[in-house]
Amino acid sequence: CTFKIPSGALLDYSGNPYQGLTLNFKIMEEAITPKLFDVIVDPNGKGDYTNIQDAIDAVPSNRTEPYLIFVANGTYEEFINVPKIKPFIHLIGQDKEKTIIARKLTSASNATGDGGEEAWQYSWRNEANQSQRFQEAVTMIYATDFYAENISFVNTWGTEKLIGPMAEAMYTANDRIAFYNCKFRSFQDTWQTKVQSSSENGINARHYASDCWIEGAVDYFYGNGNVLIENTTLYNVRYGSVITAANHTTGTNWGYVFNNCTVDGINKVDPDKYGTESLDYQPSKGTAQTLGRPWQNNPITVFLNTKLKFDI
C-alpha cells in the first residue's frame, strides 16, 4: 500500500508549505486459526459441558456437515442417545483407555432369569428405572453419519459380572456410522447393529470400524446391515465364546465382513477367575471358539485375512 501527502497540503509553523511525503508499506493479514472442535466436554468443568449427552442435546438438528465434540479423559457414567435428527455428530475422545462411557444395564425380563434380582434392578425393561427405560444399550446411535474416535464404550454389567443376560454396550441403527480406535466391552451382546427398512439406505445401511477392540463371550457382535470391520481385535473373555450372531434380511448386499482382524482371548476353563456359576464354567464343551452362528435364516458373515490365536 502507498500513503501519500501531496506537496503544499500541509504547512509548518511559519506558514511554509510542506514538500510532501510518500510512504510505501505492506499490510499483513494474520490468518485466523480455525476452531478445531465445536464444543469440549470435560468432567472437571474445563470445557463447555461436563457430560456428553448435554453436548449432544445442544447440537443443531438436521446438520449436513460434521459437528465435532471433543471428549476429555474421564469416566462418563451416563447413557448416550443420538437421535435421528442429529446427523453428523463426531465424538473425538482424548485417549481410548481413559475416555470411557460406562453404565450398568441389562435386558432382564424379570427377577428370576440370568443375574436374578440384581440383573432386574438394572434392566431397561424394569418400570422402576425411568432413567433407562427403553435404553437398550449404554450408547444408542439412531442418526446417520455418526463417527467416534478414541473412546471406550462399556457395559459394566458384562465386564464385572461376566454372566448374562444381554448387556449391550453399543446399538447402531442407521447408515454411514463409523468408529476408529475405539473399544467395545461387555459379556453378552456387546454390540448390536440393527438397521431396518426405515433406516437410510434401508437394510443395506453401512457401518465401518477400524483399529478397534470388541470384547465379549456370547453373540457379542450381532444383528444385520452391511458392516466392515478392519484391523480389529475380537477378544473372547471366556473359552467357548461365540463371536457373531447374524440376522440379515434377504437382499442384504455384503453382511458382516471382518478383514485383517485378530481373534484372541481366553481359551481354557478358569473357575477361579469366573466362578462355577458363570457361563464360562462348562468343561464338557471343550475349548473351541465359535466364529458365528445364525440368529435367523439369512446370516452373512465373512472373515478375510484374519489371524486366529486358538482353535475354532
Q: Could you describe each region identified by the protein language model?
A:
Residues K4-T33:
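Acidic, Ser/Thr/Gly/Pro-rich low-complexity segments and short DxT(G/T)-type signature motifs
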